[in-house]
A protein has these predicted regions:
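Non-ligating segments of multi-cofactor redox enzymes
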Residues: 1-152
């Protein structure tokens, strides 16, 4: 099935990661999937969770880890160095300013803004919270062009 470029996957991704904030503003609309158009073809680009992922291999802080084929991100220890962005062969990692506890604070109430790498996490937390079996982008696609393939 072919992507029709409707961007429902982008909206679903943002909604799954929005922490109940209003997302339909340019400042908050930061999907972890991007619909690209080339000539008459459209395709949704996202992390491929590569085997032996170059982004995880190059991460100096260990913020990116590969566990059971899924590349996970620990924003708490990401330094924002952007090495993973340069290493990703799909251009599927971006930098986002987010509120995290500062190094000197002990509570989430004392947040400071800093930039961290952001990429597809296969909606792991959202799926658990909502009792879903597929990521938000897969569920939202009206033509069923998205799927999750289990390797191994």
């Amino acid at each position: 099935r072919k992507c029709i470029g409707c961007k429902a996957c982008e909206v679903a991704c943002v909604m799954a990661h929005n922490d109940e904030q209003h997302v339909l503003t340019p400042q908050r609309f930061l999907p972890r999937i991007t619909v690209m158009k080339h000539e008459q073809k459209r395709n949704a680009i996202t992390c491929r969770h590569c085997e032996n992922a170059p982004c995880a291999r190059i991460c100096p802080t260990g913020a990116l880890q590969q566990d059971d084929g899924i590349v996970t991100m620990n924003a708490q220890i990401c330094s924002g160095c952007q090495l993973c962005i340069m290493a990703c062969p799909y251009g599927a990692i971006s930098l986002e300013s987010i509120g995290l506890p500062s190094a000197t604070s002990e509570t989430m109430a004392q947040k400071s803004m800093r930039s961290v790498a952001v990429r597809c996490d296969l909606c792991k937390d959202w799926m658990k919270r909502e009792g879903k079996s597929v990521p938000a982008c897969v569920e939202a696609c009206p033509v069923h062009a998205r799927s999750v393939v289990q390797i191994g």
